[in-house]
């Protein structure tokens, strides 16, 4: 099953503050939609020897080899078995590089008001915190906005 959100990209507001929210355990994180190319169901990942532990391997997307990162491993959270809601969010950067990130579930896309975004507290001692770009204060609670570049590139990442 494949969910391509490219059609939704044409309806974004001019301010570009669309955020895709996903969950790992009970915590909801966000990624700026401008980096999201597509969302696919978890599929067979080819393991590559001698790569960092958080990189699960590679997948083939329409003939392109795409590295896949476990967000759980990256954040130092215990891995769990994949289920029917486990997804790979395929990110694409300005240079054309693509990287997939494995998440427990995709939640929703929301247009976030810039006034609801604030800097993170300076608590970089927790592994996952260094990947948090900012906090988003929504009616449903505070959400954590991920810094995609740090998530992918920190300590010899995949991109």
Model-derived regions, located:
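An acidic, low-aromatic, low-complexity terminal/linker signal
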Residues: 1-159
């Amino acid at each position: 099953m494949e969910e391509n959100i490219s059609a939704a990209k044409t309806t974004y507001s001019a301010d570009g503050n669309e955020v895709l929210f996903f969950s790992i355990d009970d915590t909801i994180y966000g990624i700026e939609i401008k980096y999201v190319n597509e969302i696919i169901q978890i599929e067979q990942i080819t393991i590559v020897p001698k790569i960092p532990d958080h990189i699960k391997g590679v997948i083939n997307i329409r003939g392109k080899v795409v590295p896949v990162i476990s967000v759980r491993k990256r954040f130092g959270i215990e891995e769990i078995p994949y289920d029917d809601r486990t997804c790979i969010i395929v990110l694409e950067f300005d240079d054309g590089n693509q990287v997939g990130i494995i998440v427990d579930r995709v939640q929703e896309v929301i247009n976030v008001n810039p006034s609801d975004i604030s800097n993170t507290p300076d608590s970089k001692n927790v592994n996952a915190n260094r990947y948090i770009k900012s906090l988003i204060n929504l009616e449903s609670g505070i959400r954590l906005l991920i810094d995609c570049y740090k998530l992918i590139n920190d300590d010899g990442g995949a991109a």
